[in-house]
Design a protein with these regions (language model features):
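Short solvent-exposed loop/turn micro-motifs enriched in small/polar/acidic residues
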Residues: 12-13, 34-36, 67-68, 77-78
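Double-stranded beta-helix
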Residues: 59-60, 82-136
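Glycine- and acidic-residue-biased ligand/ion/polar-headgroup-sensing regions
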Residues: 37-56
Length: 136
């Protein structure tokens, strides 16, 4: 349901730039980028997706619907902010920029109040819960 194409040549490049092609049902577990601190920018090139911002206990504090058709193209997430994304339209493609070098998310940066990606049923239910919070 998801495929990346990296523009950066090496994972330790100072800036990571990639296309992230995703389909509805893709689970992007809520996370943050601390230690190392990294800001992240999403620019939606096609399709539709929602970015969610969470507080420390998992309450949604903001949702941003990205849709070129509606004139909303991107979102910037500051280092340390809990965030996640739900894909709302087939064929969605996001251009993502984040400081390098690439660092896999540590357990401390995965939201403890969200289901693990390996628990598909719980992840699917969580996606539906987030979708239900959006104003249609």
């Amino acid at each position: 349901l998801r495929m990346n194409y990296n523009f950066h040549e090496e994972l330790d490049d100072p800036v990571n730039r990639l296309l992230n092609a995703m389909e509805p049902g893709t689970y992007l577990r809520p996370h943050r980028h601390l230690n190392p601190d990294k800001d992240e920018v999403f620019i939606l090139l096609r399709g539709k997706a929602a970015v969610f911002i969470f507080d420390e206990v998992g309450n949604v504090t903001e949702s941003i619907i990205l849709s070129p058709a509606e004139g909303m193209y991107g979102a910037e997430i500051k280092a340390g902010v809990w965030h996640g994304m739900v894909v709302l339209e087939s064929g969605s493609v996001i251009y993502e920029v984040k400081q390098g070098p690439f660092a896999p998310l540590s357990a401390d940066n995965l939201a403890p109040w969200s289901p693990a990606a390996e628990d598909k049923d719980a992840a699917d239910a969580y996606i539906k819960k987030l979708e239900s919070l959006l104003i249609k």
